Regions:
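Short catalytic micro-motifs in class I SAM-dependent methyltransferases
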Residues: 10-15
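S-adenosyl-L-methionine-dependent methyltransferase catalytic module, highlighting the catalytic core
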Residues: 17-25, 35-160
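A short acidic, Gly/Pro-enriched loop at the edge of an enzyme's catalytic core
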Residues: 1-7
Length: 163
């Protein structure tokens, strides 16, 4: 069994069905002084449902569309002309969604502690994709959980084993 000084998990955890098992395994693989870097889009952010992957311009550019309750989300996707396969993929992301609160619980449950956590209003990888400069979430939005959850486009988190 090899232990790792650094493990990077970027934009992955929101696609994993068994998130507690993943986090527990990552904690097992982490060296005692090792660092786990996790980046994830909080579920309630404007495109937390990954609907930007939709084919229709409406669905791909409609912020918070994924937050429609129950059957309204797949109905809206069908109405926009999405294929059954695309809808199934987007609903799968809804099933594996991750919020800031859920991520913190998963980390603690795996015996990990947060070293640092940074929230971004403009995700750093949007610079390469869209030419937008990264911007941290303003402190006022960061300290109010519901505002943070709706406006943070990504969270960068460094974790270590609890001592």
């Amino acid at each position: 069994n090899h232990l790792y000084d650094l493990i990077i998990l970027r934009d992955v955890i929101e696609h994993v069905e068994d998130q507690p098992r993943l986090m527990a395994r990552l904690a097992e693989l982490l060296a005692p002084d090792g660092v786990l870097f996790v980046a994830y889009p909080p579920w309630r952010m404007p495109f937390g449902g990954h609907q930007q992957m939709a084919v229709s311009r409406f669905a791909a550019h409609c912020p918070w569309l994924h937050l429609l309750p129950g059957p309204l989300y797949p109905w809206a996707l069908r109405l926009a002309g999405e294929t059954p396969g695309k809808i199934a993929g987007l609903l799968e992301i809804r099933d594996t969604r991750i919020s800031v609160r859920k991520f913190r619980r998963l980390a603690a449950g795996a015996g990990l502690r947060t070293v640092t956590e940074r929230f971004f209003l403009i995700n750093p990888h949007y610079e390469a994709k869209f030419g937008l400069k990264p911007r941290c979430l303003p402190r006022l939005l960061e300290v109010v959980p519901w505002l943070r959850d709706f406006f943070a486009t990504t969270c960068f988190c460094l974790l270590q084993r609890q001592e």
